[in-house]
Structures are given as structure tokens and as C-alpha cells.
């Protein structure tokens, strides 16, 4: 997804020079012509704590200004996984399968116990 003005983003990398860690939320406040984005980070009072030029590979869009909606969870996960190395992506897939299988077993067990 191409970032747009006022989209909400989540950092994928630490930015020690700005004292920002991966996972920090910010907002695109300017789109530069060279495919970099000026991203503003604020504190709880809405005061700017950092203004950083970032490449799109350094963050994920998590809130779309145009639609005024959060990125659906499945899309958020998929976008994050695409930034992982192949082996880490396979670990995520294995974990998702584990969770799915566990949920299926719980559903089967509760259905059996309730007599349905």
C-alpha cells in the first residue's frame, strides 16, 4: 500500500537518533517527490516529539486517512510478514496454524461436552 498524506503508520525499525522504537505510531505529514515521507510522532498531549524523513520500507500504514479506517487485522499481519525474512515468515505461518488447530480442538471439545 502506498502511504498517503495523514495516514497513520507504525515504525518497523528503531530510530535511535530520534529515540523511537519499532512499533511506535506516527502520521505522514508530507510526501516528498523522492519517495520519502515526513512522519510526525507525538506524545499523549499531542506535542510533536519527532519529525523524521522515512522510506516506505521503514514503516507500515495502519490507518488510512482517505477511508478514515484502520487497516484490517489480516492486512496488517500480512503487510508485516512481507517485511520479514522467509524463515521468519514460515515461523509466523506455523504459529498461525498452531493457533487455528488449538481453536478447532477447543471448539470440538466444547461441542462434545455440551452434547451438540
List where the protein language model places each region.
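Basic/aromatic-rich interaction segments and small domains that mediate binding to polyanionic partners
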Residues: 3-58
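C-terminal structural segments of small proteins and small subunits
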Residues: 47-48, 54-61, 78-93
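Mixed-charge, Lys/Arg-rich low-complexity intrinsically disordered regions
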Residues: 1-15, 86-87, 94, 100, ...
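Short amphipathic alpha-helical interaction elements located at domain edges
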Residues: 70-79, 87-116
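Compositionally biased, intrinsically disordered low-complexity segments enriched
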Residues: 12, 32, 40-42, 60, ...
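Intrinsically disordered, low-complexity linker and terminal regions at domain boundaries
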Residues: 62-72
Amino acid at each position: 500500500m502506498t502511504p498517503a498524506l495523514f495516514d497513520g503508520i507504525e515504525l518497523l525499525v528503531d530510530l535511535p537518533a530520534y529515540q523511537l522504537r519499532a512499533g511506535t505510531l506516527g502520521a505522514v505529514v508530507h510526501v516528498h517527490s523522492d519517495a520519502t515521507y515526513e512522519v510526525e510522532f507525538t506524545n499523549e498531549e499531542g506535542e510533536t516529539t519527532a519529525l523524521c524523513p522515512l522510506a516506505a520500507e521503514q514503516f507500515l500504514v495502519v490507518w488510512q486517512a482517505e477511508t478514515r479506517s484502520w487497516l484490517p487485522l489480516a492486512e496488517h499481519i500480512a503487510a508485516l510478514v512481507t517485511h520479514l525474512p522467509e524463515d521468519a515468515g514460515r515461523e509466523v505461518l506455523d504459529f498461525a496454524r498452531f493457533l487455528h488447530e488449538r481453536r478447532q480442538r477447543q471448539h470440538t471439545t466444547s461441542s462434545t461436552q455440551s452434547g451438540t
